[in-house]
């Protein structure tokens, strides 16, 4: 009987010792989010292609987009359906140019002005570069950020806009949005990304 008690006590001590040395499982959505943010911000070269649906109180439209980001410079190709026209947006620290398929070429210090001129819609292009990847944009304060259990953004409020992430994909081991809704008042943009490509 005494030997049995000693054996049980020894096993219990062994189990407790093993439990004490095992690392705590990391299942913190905020930690996962911060890890993804660091990796995504370090990824300065990327491509994304998909579609955008634009809506106001009394109008709606859609276009396809091809976004090519290389450091601080970018090229975005916009195409309206049924041959209604296309444009290329080229931007960087010096400003932004927009060239249309009709041969028009316009310059502005920010992309929002040019996209509004071409499409007639308000689109937060400068912030979209970050929101597309599930990141907050530098500058304006983040008013709200909700994460899902996997540490991915569900809802982001920034610069007066609300970004709701509806679906996600995985590219090079990184979570990247597949579908997101962006809205401010009666203006809204739904973006669906078909393909992501990250530089190795």
Curated annotation (Swiss-Prot):
Residues annotated as signal peptide: 1-18
Residues with lipid group (N-palmitoyl cysteine): 19
Keywords: Cell outer membrane, Chaperone, Lipoprotein, Membrane, Palmitate, Protein transport, Signal, Transport
Localization (cell): Cell outer membrane
Single biological process term from Gene Ontology: protein transport
Membrane-related topology note: Lipid-anchor
S-diacylglycerol cysteine-type lipidated residues: 19
Pfam families on file: LolB (PF03550)
Family the UniProt entry places it in: Belongs to the LolB family.
Protein name (Swiss-Prot/TrEMBL): Outer-membrane lipoprotein LolB
Native source species: Alkalilimnicola ehrlichii (strain ATCC BAA-1101 / DSM 17681 / MLHE-1)
């Amino acid at each position: 009987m005494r030997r049995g008690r000693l054996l049980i006590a020894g096993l219990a001590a062994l189990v407790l010792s093993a439990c004490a040395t095992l690392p705590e499982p990391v299942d913190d959505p905020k930690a996962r989010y911060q890890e993804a943010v660091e990796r995504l911000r370090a990824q300065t070269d990327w491509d994304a292609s998909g579609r955008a649906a634009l809506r106001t109180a009394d109008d709606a439209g859609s276009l396809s987009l091809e976004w090519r980001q290389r450091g601080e410079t970018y090229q975005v190709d916009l195409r309206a359906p049924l041959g209604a026209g296309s444009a290329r947006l080229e931007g960087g620290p010096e400003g932004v140019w927009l060239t249309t398929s009709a041969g028009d070429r316009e310059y502005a210090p920010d992309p929002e002005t040019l996209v509004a001129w071409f499409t007639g819609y308000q689109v937060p292009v400068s912030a979209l570069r970050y929101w597309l990847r599930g990141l907050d944009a530098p500058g304006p304060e983040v008013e709200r950020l909700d994460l899902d259990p996997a540490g991915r953004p569900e809802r982001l409020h920034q610069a007066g806009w609300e970004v709701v992430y509806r679906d996600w994909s995985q590219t090079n081991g990184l979570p990247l949005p597949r579908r997101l809704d962006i809205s401010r008042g009666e203006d809204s943009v739904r973006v669906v990304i078909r393909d992501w490509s990250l530089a190795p």
